[in-house]
Regions:
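Short beta-strand/loop motif that positions the catalytic acidic residue
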Residues: 229-231, 236-238, 242
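An N-terminal hydrophobic leader/cap segment in hydrolases
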Residues: 4-56, 66
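Hydrolase active-site cap/lid region
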Residues: 162-216
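Conserved alpha/beta-hydrolase
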Residues: 98-118
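Alpha/beta-hydrolase active-site loop
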Residues: 91, 122-143
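Catalytic histidine-centered segment of alpha/beta-hydrolase-like enzymes
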Residues: 270-280
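Catalytic active-site module of serine/aspartate enzymes centered on a nucleophile-bearing elbow/loop
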Residues: 278-296
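The serine-hydrolase catalytic nucleophile loop
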Residues: 85-98, 111
Length: 296
């Protein structure tokens, strides 16, 4: 009996040690070091004209991307396309193709710590909003008079909202399936990963550790606060069956959004990655109608 209790105590100690390692080391890096993804796809493969983009960040990283050119004789505007966590610039090339056919140029790029861009850690908008500001500066140096918008989904939407609050030269935004607060969404993800089990205190501890590792302040990554400063026209969309980011977060962002020119579209039956599949032509028309309103 005593031997069994000893084995049980050792087993429980082992579990505690492994749990501590997970919370202290594994989870924080999982938050700020997503797997790098890139696809063997170039704009020319889709018949697009482009120029390479290499924009330095304020902390001396190089952001890699493409400036996709208009297929029309004139250019009606430019939109910065911002991908989500673990994504890459190539994911947006089909959208860039659609915009190009309408005379709208776009910037597709890899966020820091993603794809071909430099950087070891992502910060969910804390540093990325200033990366967007650097891209805006690059665009305006070459095309100062063209209307400029931003389009982001998931983490890219959170980055876009924070950039819109910071940078008035971005004139409109399209935001799909994004979150309100980094601390909340990290807790949500971990709870889902652990099949319903989750401790907010442990989640916040892992996030605080991630902030120290990646040199940023997680408590300042709050798109719900950013929207209260945004005056530009905004199109918000969310699927009511989103399994990653609750549709209620999209509704909260809309309710707190300062801009009087705002639109919220809830796509019935759409999950985190299926707005266009479930929304069909009707959703696409709503999106493009908004874009048409703010380009030339």
């Amino acid at each position: 009996m005593k031997k069994k209790l000893t084995y049980l105590a050792l087993f429980l100690l082992f579990l505690l040690i492994m749990g501590f390692i997970g919370i202290h080391q594994v989870a924080p890096y999982a938050i700020v070091q997503p797997p790098r993804v890139s696809l063997p796809l170039h704009p020319k493969d889709l018949g697009l004209k482009s120029s390479p983009l290499n924009v330095p960040t304020k902390d001396s990283l190089a952001l890699a991307g493409y400036w996709i050119k208009s297929q029309q004789d004139s250019t009606r505007g430019i939109i910065i396309l911002v991908h989500g966590i673990g994504g890459c610039k190539e994911h947006f090339l089909e959208l860039a193709q659609e915009l190009s056919s309408q005379g709208i140029e776009s910037i597709v790029f890899d966020n820091r710590a993603h794809g071909s861009s430099e950087g070891q850690f992502c910060t969910y908008g804390y540093k990325e909003k200033e990366d967007i500001q650097q891209i805006v500066q690059h665009i305006k140096a070459q095309a100062p008079d063209l209307p400029l918008g931003i389009w982001g989904n998931s983490m890219g939407g959170a980055i876009a909202l924070q950039a819109l609050a910071l940078e008035p030269r971005i004139e409109f935004g399209l935001i799909e399936s994004t979150f309100t607060d980094l601390s909340q969404i990290v807790f949500d993800y971990k709870k889902r990963l652990l099949k319903g089990f989750g401790s907010r205190a442990l989640s916040d501890y892992a996030l605080a550790r991630a902030g120290k590792i990646a040199d940023f302040e997680p408590s300042q990554v709050k798109p719900i606060q950013a929207v209260q400063q945004i005056e530009q026209p905004i199109f918000l969309a969310h699927g009511d069956a989103d399994e990653n980011i609750k549709v209620s977060y999209g509704q909260q962002l809309f309710e707190h959004l300062k801009s009087p020119q705002k639109q919220l579209v809830i796509v019935e039956g759409a999950g985190h990655f299926s707005l266009y599949e479930k929304g069909g032509e009707g959703y696409k028309k709503q999106v493009m109608a908004f874009v048409e309103e703010w380009v030339r």
